[in-house]
């Protein structure tokens, strides 16, 4: 838990009964904010299996055994939906995905200390233990980070580990919130949270899964087959509730798209595909998807976006200049470079007149994007004054 005295924090309570959970959530709904974390298992399944929810209040911390028989989690859903209570997470994306699946909605309002830390200049995706140490002087014991949280009973060491995540988070949140409020940057955090508040962020569209494999050809017939095969895998993995790579690996999908097998015997020849798979239900539905894609008219086939084609590659020199500008702006404003602009943002800035990228919206445009466009268009250039990068107006 912490090198500091455990008396700093309330002793964790293990919740296994519905009446205790209801009472806890009633108490927490009277507070201005609550810190939240989850422990789950996903190594053997497509859908995450929620095993533990941790809730931290001013005077209480609870570890909720979500696998306890007949435990009614409805009070947790009501707490998450309460607009009067800020829900505080660190690196919340997977937690929110789980709550969206379980309760059908995204917690509101919420605050992610990982996002806030990047806005406050702690670097790209700073680790939680680093934040705890820097902002509170505490220490996170990592011994149980890879525990099997589905096994019961939970040990006292697991309970203490789970509770520590939300107890330390209170100090992290309060320090970051106060710092960003003083610097006038809380609105920046709110802009970032808009993405995490959008249900579309957590949806997986089977039809677009092929793009993750980043194929190097623009043969549209091949891409049509790859799109169909990847979509099939996503739907089948969901149906079987197994990880997509356990069902069939990416390399196998690429090979199947190239060979376009028409029967089980041909499918079984593909790397990583056995005869049992090819002749079973999964093999039959995969072959049906391939056959359907093979019959698509040319107009319905996908293509790689033009910005990724060889003829639209960005100028390495211009991208390098944009990276220098990004580093300078990041240092000037004490904000993580990755939060200002991604590598894809820089590539598109270098190849498109005014691309639709995050770097050109909201506070990012004010801090970096507008000058990036000016640099690309020759309206400013970069100079060096001692150890500082300077922007020089041309003309």
Swiss-Prot record:
Locations listed in the record: Cytoplasm
Domain HRDC as annotated: residue spans: 219-300
GO terms under biological process: tRNA 3'-end processing
Gene3D superfamilies, per the entry: HRDC domain (1.10.150.80), Ribonuclease H-like superfamily/Ribonuclease H (3.30.420.10)
PROSITE patterns: HRDC
Catalytic activity entry: Exonucleolytic cleavage that removes extra residues from the 3'-terminus of tRNA to produce 5'-mononucleotides
Keywords assigned by UniProt, alphabetized: Cytoplasm, Exonuclease, Hydrolase, Nuclease, tRNA processing
Cofactor: a divalent metal cation
This protein's GO CC annotations: cytoplasm
InterPro entries referenced in this protein's UniProt entry, alphabetically: 3'-5'_exonuclease_dom, HRDC-like_sf, HRDC_dom, HRDC_dom_sf, RNase_D, RNase_D-like, RNaseH-like_sf, RNaseH_sf
EC number(s) recorded for this UniProt protein: 3.1.13.5
Domain 3'-5' exonuclease per the UniProt entry, residue ranges: 14-181
A Gene Ontology molecular function term of the record: nucleotide binding
Entry's family note: Belongs to the RNase D family.
HAMAP family tied to this protein: RNase_D (MF_01899)
Its biological purpose: Exonuclease involved in the 3' processing of various precursor tRNAs. Initiates hydrolysis at the 3'-terminus of an RNA molecule and releases 5'-mononucleotides.
UniProt-recorded name of the protein: Ribonuclease D
Species assigned in the record: Granulibacter bethesdensis (strain ATCC BAA-1260 / CGDNIH1)
